[in-house]
Structures are given as structure tokens and as C-alpha cells.
From Swiss-Prot:
InterPro entries: Ribosomal_bL20 (IPR005813), RIBOSOMAL_L20_CS (IPR049946), Ribosomal_protein_bL20_C (IPR035566). It holds the Pfam family Ribosomal_L20. Binds directly to 23S ribosomal RNA and is necessary for the in vitro assembly process of the 50S ribosomal subunit. It is not involved in the protein synthesizing functions of that subunit. CDD domains: Ribosomal_L20 (cd07026). Transmembrane segments: none annotated. This is Large ribosomal subunit protein bL20. The keyword Ribosomal protein applies. The gene is rplT. Keywords: Ribonucleoprotein, Ribosomal protein, RNA-binding, rRNA-binding. Belongs to the bacterial ribosomal protein bL20 family. The keyword Ribosomal protein applies. Coiled coil: none annotated.
Length: 119
């Protein structure tokens, strides 16, 4: 069985990790053993935060819808309930955009929701 020299593969593996650690502070950017741990931890944060981003944006949309609904004299929950009863299926992302950039359209939706609740 021939002897396997691992210099090329080891160097490639080290380089791959050190390229990923580019921009890190201190020895995390140029010492392989430390950079490897930092890159692993960064990957864990990325994985976690990709999921958290979805939750945070939903919270932001709800806060914006709530603020706009309260300006029109409604709570968020009653506004959403009115929309559901009026069979208006608009997601929270679009509602938040309407609340920020197109107040008359949002007010029209709120009026429909109010009418549905009053009936």
C-alpha cells in the first residue's frame, strides 16, 4: 500500500476555514484551531438567527399593524378578527406595508373590518 502524504489536503482544509474566518478579530482570523471554533460558532448563530429573523419580522409587522389600527380606533386583535369575518385574506407583511406606505388603503380595510364587526 503506498504512503499517503496529506500536506495538500490539510492545507486546503485549513485554508477553507481561514477564508471563512476572514474579518474576525485577533487570533480567530489566522490561527486554525481558534478559527475553526469561531467558524463553527458563527454557523450555529447563523442557523439560529435564520429562524429568529422570521419571528422578529412577524413581530415587527404586528406592531406596525397595531399602531395603525389604534390610530383608527381599533385594537390589533379586533382588526384582524374583522378582516377574517369579512373574508379579506391579506397577510401581515402586506398589511404592515399598507399601514406604513398607503394609509388610505389601510383605512379602507379597517372600515370594512369595522363594518363586519358591527353587523
Amino acid at each position: 500500500m503506498p504512503r499517503v502524504k496529506r500536506g495538500v489536503t490539510a492545507r486546503a482544509r485549513h485554508k477553507k476555514v481561514l477564508v471563512q474566518a476572514k474579518g474576525y478579530r485577533g487570533r480567530r482570523k489566522n490561527v486554525y484551531r481558534i478559527a475553526k471554533q469561531a467558524v463553527m460558532k458563527a454557523g450555529q448563530y447563523q442557523y439560529r438567527d435564520r429562524r429568529q429573523r422570521k419571528r422578529q419580522f412577524r413581530s415587527l409587522w404586528i406592531a406596525r399593524i397595531n399602531a395603525a389600527a389604534r390610530e383608527l380606533g381599533m385594537k390589533y386583535s379586533t382588526f384582524m378578527n374583522g378582516l377574517k369575518k369579512a373574508n379579506i385574506e391579506v397577510d401581515r407583511k402586506v398589511l404592515a406595508d399598507l399601514a406604513v406606505f398607503d394609509q388610505p388603503a389601510f383605512a379602507a380595510l379597517a372600515a370594512q373590518a369595522k363594518a363586519q364587526l358591527g353587523a
